[in-house]
Amino acid sequence: MRPIYLDHQSTTPVSPEVFAAVKPYFTEAFGNPSALHQHGLRARDALARAREQCAALIHAESPDDILFTSGGTESANLAVKGVAYASRRKGNHIIVSAIEHPAVLNSVEFLEAEGFTCTRVPVDATGWVDPEAVRSAIIDKTILICVHHVNHDLGVIEPIHDLGKIAAANGIPLFVDAVMSGGWLPIDVQEMGASLLSLAPHRFYGLKGVGVLYRHRKARLASIIHGGIQEGGRRAGTENVPAIVGAGAAAELARRELPQRKAKTERLQKELWDGLRTNIPYLKLNGPEPGPRRIPTNLNLSVEFIEGEGLALLADVNGIALASGAACVGKAVKIPPVLTAIGLEPSLAQGNIILSLGQENTEEEIDRVLETLPKLVAKLRGLSPLWDEFQRGLIDSAINPKAGRKSAPGETAKGPRPA
């Protein structure tokens, strides 16, 4: 039986269409885009085409606004550090949400060590950023606002259009990390008011090893990698032509298939969430309910009384690939900073799992997941001292304190019923 892949926000398989597009650039059109001969010209033309395709996906004004990097992490580093270094004379203050991706938060920490300052705007219990809190954080030395389009853990869709208006009204560039949403949600950088926006094509059926950074022509950006004058002098180094061709092909595919992808994942997300909450008691959805404020590919869940890492490992043995936010480090459980930022209790954070859907998932696969996961949870709870204490009334549930003790289907106080 084919394994079920529910970890699409980590990476996606390369689509056959993308794979077909990139193959010639490994063995036939292998030239260096900077070379003057026909091999270089063919590679250079391929880069130009990929810029057009990526620009079309996000409705950029010009293909010249597209820069290629080695990945989403480098794109974020270039956006944050590049704007900061280019704006030193104007100011040194950066605003970020408290739950940005580490590529952004760690870049900001690096800059703080160099004398920049940062305001980390808190979020509500669903991970939503209040635009008024961002407005209130602006000072005369603010040079950059960083808020992601969709959070990488919670799946919450942030109010980017409102933030774009605030940034524009104050003459401050807005950097939007769209790695989580690119290829899955409509993106229009002009309507958003984004000065910079990053994508990672391997998240929407492209290749790993390439990133995209949109930069509005008026956004000042210093280079952070020095060498040649590739990418308009803003990103030195010979371009990864096959991966960039793949980025363009994946962008074109996403633009063409976006309505179908969105509709399908919305349907599967609802079916999956409805089935899991019906069959697994003491299960919490982190982030907004499925709907207009949540990306349809993501379900972030807390399974009470067990550890998410254990469930992820057991699911893998049973042919289901999913992610766990919490991980064991030595004898302690490391809680994801995002879950801490939304105020999730540690007892729930340690039971965190993330299921992320893709266009190749089927209703039959969802049915298998709904048949399998409740049994795995019952098995782990049968081995859990916390579940045993809860069943004996010694501790209470953090999810539903007033519900009283309750066994899941197939569970007893001592574990799963024998088959």
Where is each model-derived feature located?
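Pyridoxal 5′-phosphate
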Residues: M1-A419
